[in-house]
């Protein structure tokens, strides 16, 4: 139940990010970045709480898990930054009218590169997690991450218009 509530909050936040990408009139790097950072901080705190409540970690497991979790989130944030840059580029191109073929191809390749990096990152963290958690808890954590990511991607996909 707690995971469902968190996913609803996450979905709301995911819908807000593309609207920041389409903000016009504000000087680059001002209000829109501040708003995105506020959303990120809220999401980070909520996500950590949900993970904590759904992992049932022993004290020894928690001692090993949280540093790996924090490193994973830092790396995930770097990927999110790349994706947000791609979304902003798409919003700029979309707002100008029909997106040129070369621009569409470039943006598509950037988005696919982020997906490739995300999978590579997930694979690189499994052995790190296996050093501090039993296999079932590693699988559970990766399921939680995957479910959250799927909801975010679904909401982003629903809020970003198709190329024309």
PLM region spans:
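Sec-dependent signal peptide cleavage junction
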Residues: 19-41
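Amphipathic alpha-helical segments
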Residues: 29, 36-37, 50-132
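Bacterial N-terminal signal peptides that target proteins for export
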Residues: 1-8
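Short, linear, compositionally biased motifs with a strong N-terminal bias
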Residues: 10-13
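Amphipathic, charged alpha-helical segments and their helix-to-coil junctions
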Residues: 35-38, 42, 116-164
């Amino acid at each position: 139940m707690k995971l469902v509530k968190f996913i609803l909050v996450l979905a709301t936040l995911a819908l807000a990010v593309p609207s920041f990408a389409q903000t016009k009139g504000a000087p680059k790097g001002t209000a829109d970045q501040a708003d995105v950072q506020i959303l990120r901080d809220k999401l980070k705190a909520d996500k950590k709480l949900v993970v904590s409540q759904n992992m049932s970690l022993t004290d020894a497991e928690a001692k090993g898990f949280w540093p790996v979790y924090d490193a994973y989130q830092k790396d995930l944030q770097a990927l999110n930054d790349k994706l947000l840059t791609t979304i902003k580029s798409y919003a700029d191109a979309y707002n100008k009218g029909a997106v040129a073929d070369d621009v569409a191809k470039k943006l598509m390749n950037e988005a696919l590169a982020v997906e490739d990096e995300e999978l590579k990152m997930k694979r690189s963290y499994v052995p790190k997690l296996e050093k501090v958690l039993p296999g079932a808890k590693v699988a559970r954590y990766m399921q939680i991450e995957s479910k959250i990511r799927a909801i975010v991607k679904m909401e982003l996909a629903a809020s970003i218009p198709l190329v024309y």
